[in-house]
Amino acid sequence: MVAVAVMGAGSWGTTMTKVFADAGNTVRLWARRDEVADEIQSTRRNQCYLPGVVIPDAVTATSDPRVALTDADIVVLGVPSHAVRDSLTRWRDFLPDDALIVSLPKGLERDTARRMSEVIAEASGRPSEKIAVLSGPNLAKEVADEQPAATVVACTDHDSAKRVQEACTTAYFRPYTNTDVIGCEIGGVAKNVIALAAGMAAGQNLGFNTAATIITRGLAETVRLGTALGANPATFSGLAGLGDLVATCNSPLSRNRTFGEHLSQGMSLEEAQEACHGQVAEGVNACRAIQSLARAHSVDVPIADAVVSVCFDGATVKESIMNLMERDTKAE
């Protein structure tokens, strides 16, 4: 049993709180809003972000980050990618010296295109062997409902990955370890962008052929980019690559897919965000960073380019699909 601090009470942070508690650990859950922490503590529910799920008694909720972080062996970051640097900068003095930090958000820093593990290292001063990434086909509601799922815990230090793995293994949640942090992070980021494209196609009532094409060619550009950044190509055929991509592109529970559908139906970014209960899909924040990384490494990412054109350049989904189909023919 270890002491776990989960920093962020959104749907995924709350779900992983339940997983760590069900694995036999004591867990403190930090919520940014006082009322969310109070509701969890008094009712064992988080109706705003994870309705209908009972939060175990082993969980203590608080809105005080110092209280949440005190004596934690594992610190799980559940804040959105755009908030990671500022949050860790504020919490740096409270972080226990020996704690492992586990990253949940699947995004890139908007201005720098840095991966979350890189941002965490810079903001916390921790070495890479103390920073892990959790990534895989993990839709929060399904995991919270204890439907069988698997994931990947990636860290450059296998022993650290093993510690996190042991702390979050339950009868319904099976983590595997990996030392390819770059591959697991790029797989998690890119699939959000590809899922936006899949949602856009679904919003146009396009069928399975189109969906399969987007997933397959999306995987191809993810492998190209990841390999250029130093990832192991084999990672992308595993849970943190293909597994996550398939789940996120196909499920109606996927925020990125749903967001893409809204955009395809003519909504603006602001309207789509409102339709998604005020939450922006990570793929919207990541698509330009993916494009920037790809250009810096001379990698072709046509689907990501198409998503950028719809989200930020005023292109319609139909125009973007036509542009993709009219590209020069080539070998697969």
Swiss-Prot record:
It is found in: Cytoplasm. The keyword Lipid biosynthesis applies. Gene3D superfamilies: N-(1-d-carboxylethyl)-l-norvaline Dehydrogenase, domain 2, NAD(P)-binding Rossmann-like Domain. The active site is at 191 (proton acceptor). Its EC number is 1.1.1.94. NADPH binds at residues 11-12, 32-33, 106, 140, 255, 280, 282. It comes from Corynebacterium kroppenstedtii (strain DSM 44385 / JCM 11950 / CIP 105744 / CCUG 35717). It catalyses: sn-glycerol 3-phosphate + NAD(+) = dihydroxyacetone phosphate + NADH + H(+); sn-glycerol 3-phosphate + NADP(+) = dihydroxyacetone phosphate + NADPH + H(+). This is Glycerol-3-phosphate dehydrogenase [NAD(P)+]. Pathway: Membrane lipid metabolism; glycerophospholipid metabolism. The keyword NADP applies. Sn-glycerol 3-phosphate binds at residues 106, 136, 191, 244, 254-256. GO terms for molecular function: glycerol-3-phosphate dehydrogenase [NAD(P)+] activity; NAD binding. The lineage of its organism: Bacteria, Bacillati, Actinomycetota, Actinomycetes, Mycobacteriales. Catalyzes the reduction of the glycolytic intermediate dihydroxyacetone phosphate (DHAP) to sn-glycerol 3-phosphate (G3P), the key precursor for phospholipid synthesis. GO terms for cellular component: cytosol. Keywords: Cytoplasm, Lipid biosynthesis, Lipid metabolism, NAD, NADP, Nucleotide-binding, Oxidoreductase, Phospholipid biosynthesis, Phospholipid metabolism. InterPro entries: 6-PGluconate_DH-like_C_sf, 6PGD_dom2, G3P_DH_NAD-dep, G3P_DH_NAD-dep_C, G3P_DH_NAD-dep_N, NAD(P)-bd_dom_sf. GO terms for biological process: carbohydrate metabolic process; glycerol-3-phosphate biosynthetic process; glycerol-3-phosphate catabolic process; glycerophospholipid metabolic process; phospholipid biosynthetic process. Belongs to the NAD-dependent glycerol-3-phosphate dehydrogenase family. SUPFAM superfamilies: 6-phosphogluconate dehydrogenase C-terminal domain-like, NAD(P)-binding Rossmann-fold domains.
